[in-house]
Amino acid sequence: MTNVWFATDVNLINCVLKDNLFLIDNNYIILNVFDQETDQVRPLCLGEINALQTDAAAQADAMLDTSSTSELQSNAST
């Protein structure tokens, strides 16, 4: 599935996110949104970051992208 981004889409996203997306206490992702019921802008928590993986941990726990031919299974009958 390929998404095609038009210049108007990119401009709209940039306008919404510019100076509007915040990280609080290195844990909470906050976005200011317009509440139509109260006719006011209010903060909305998009989520919480519970864990970060450092480069050292990523290298130690990384899975290999390739396998040797002896590890590959074959569906061919002999």
Curated annotation (Swiss-Prot):
Transmembrane segments: none annotated. This is Late expression factor 10. Keywords: DNA replication, Host nucleus, Transcription, Transcription regulation, Viral DNA replication. Belongs to the baculoviridae LEF-10 family. The keyword Transcription regulation applies. Plays an essential role in viral DNA replication. Its main location: host cell. It is found in: Host nucleus. GO terms for biological process: DNA replication; viral DNA genome replication. The lineage of its organism: Viruses, Viruses incertae sedis, Naldaviricetes, Lefavirales, Baculoviridae. Pfam families: Baculo_LEF-10 (PF07206). GO terms for cellular component: host cell nucleus. The keyword DNA-binding does not apply. The gene is LEF-10.
